[in-house]
């Protein structure tokens, strides 16, 4: 999308760092896609394996010895027995709704790449798998007001209103919203639940309520004190996913509000925040912590990259796309407008966004160097400096 150069998909890339096993990059993407398709659990959702993004949610671990690694899945889970069935547990049961959401969020990009490379048969096949995954999320991954987090090794819900602790987790919510899983109804309920149950003045907590005891079938996440790290801390990395989801849903005020809650430059109480005003922290202590609002582990996070995407592409709406530079903001209604300079595919675009009707989303017109264009994608300009005016409405 950034370069418009599809030849990169033909580049030979090693498997296992072995040049003899090299295949085109597109083949690597295909294998990644079908790794999810071919590794599903009882509900048709992706198996979580050792962990997904949250490496402290160890649903196949069953660590009962202090100091033992939370990644020793193969040796420990085989010793466990399902008390309801008497059968030994295995790694073919615990599923991740987060991975399902990520799959339905990014999978369509693989479909589009296949179409642009002329492989419509593969594109249709992949799209069918995405549709099937969405159906599984709706049927088995929806809890009524938000999306489940997972199913554990016993096949029980994680991140459900049925749980006493850890009723709701942040990770699957944004990806499922941006995938349009369940349509407008699910989106509205999910975003409302995020604000109600995860929202705090210092950011969105990862889960709620916090765990107050060690839960062997959940693993490391339940070992931290409440409000810290993955146990109901404010994990800045995944706050950005909710900013993106809010912007995608046209909730520009909410998206920017969430952005300011964790952005270092907006933190005025340095005695509380205690982290440099120019760097993101991995986490901010959550509402259950003794020092609620104190940032920890600066520089150790993918937050900066995700927040750059959230503010530049989802909120300000300057989006590299396959056919050109797309203008699609989702901003606070009170904004009159703003200006952005963007270098893209050899050209510099000085972009002025005007918001006379004070809306959050929607582009009424776009002009490039005074000439109106159709739609909101600037195409075919590969040199020079150009003045762009986009009017919202």
Regions found by a protein language model. Give the residues of each.
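Aromatic-rich carbohydrate-recognition surfaces in CAZymes
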Residues: 1-49, 96-100, 104, 187, ...
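Alpha-helix C-terminal capping/termination sites
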Residues: 2, 115-116, 179-182, 245-248
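Active-site acid/base region of carbohydrate-active enzymes
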Residues: 2-97, 121, 125-154, 191-218, ...
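Juxtamembrane interface elements at the cytosolic ends of transmembrane helices
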Residues: 7, 106-116
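Solvent-exposed loop and edge beta-strand segments that line ligand/cofactor-binding
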Residues: 84-100, 156-179, 221-239, 244, ...
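Heptad-repeat amphipathic alpha-helical coiled-coil interaction surface used
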Residues: 103-104, 111, 123, 130
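Flexible, glycine/threonine-enriched loop-and-boundary segments that flank and lead into catalytic domains
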Residues: 150-164, 223, 343-354
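Non-catalytic C-terminal accessory modules of carbohydrate-active enzymes
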Residues: 196-200, 212, 225-231, 244-393
């Amino acid at each position: 999308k950034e370069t418009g150069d599809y030849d990169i998909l033909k580049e030979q890339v090693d498997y296992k760092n072995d040049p003899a096993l090299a295949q085109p990059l597109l083949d690597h993407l295909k294998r990644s896609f079908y790794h999810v398709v071919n590794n599903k659990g009882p509900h048709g959702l992706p198996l979580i394996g050792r962990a997904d993004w949250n490496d402290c949610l160890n649903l196949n671990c069953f660590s009962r010895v202090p100091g033992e690694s939370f990644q020793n899945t193969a040796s420990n889970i085989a010793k466990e027995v399902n008390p309801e069935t008497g059968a030994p547990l295995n790694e073919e049961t615990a599923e991740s709704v987060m991975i399902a959401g990520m799959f339905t969020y990014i999978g369509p990009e693989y479909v589009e790449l296949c179409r642009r490379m002329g492989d419509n048969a593969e594109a249709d096949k992949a799209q069918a798998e995405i549709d099937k995954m969405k159906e599984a999320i709706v049927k088995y991954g929806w809890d009524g007001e938000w999306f489940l987090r997972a199913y554990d090794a016993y096949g029980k819900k994680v991140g459900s209103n049925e749980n006493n602790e850890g009723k709701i987790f942040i990770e699957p919510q944004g990806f499922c919203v941006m995938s349009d899983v369940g349509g407008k109804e699910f989106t509205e309920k999910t975003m409302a639940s995020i604000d109600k149950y995860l929202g705090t003045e210092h950011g969105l907590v990862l889960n709620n309520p916090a765990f107050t005891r060690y839960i062997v079938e959940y693993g490391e996440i339940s070992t931290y004190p409440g409000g810290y790290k993955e146990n109901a801390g404010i994990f800045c990395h995944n706050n950005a996913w909710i900013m993106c989801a809010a912007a995608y849903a046209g909730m520009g005020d909410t998206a920017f509000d969430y952005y300011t809650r964790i952005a270092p430059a907006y933190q005025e109480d340095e005695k509380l925040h205690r982290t440099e005003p120019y760097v993101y922290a991995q986490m901010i202590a959550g509402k259950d912590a003794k020092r609620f609002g104190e940032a920890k582990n600066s520089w150790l996070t993918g937050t900066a990259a995700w927040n750059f995407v959230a503010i530049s592409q989802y909120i300000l709406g300057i989006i590299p796309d396959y056919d050109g530079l797309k203008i699609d903001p989702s901003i606070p209604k009170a904004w009159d407008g703003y200006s952005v300079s963007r270098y893209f595919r050899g050209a510099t675009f000085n972009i002025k966004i005007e918001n006379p009707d004070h809306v959050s989303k929607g582009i009424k017109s776009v002009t490039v160097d005074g000439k109106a264009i159709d739609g909101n994608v600037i195409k075919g300009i590969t040199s020079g400096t150009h003045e762009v005016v986009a009017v919202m409405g």
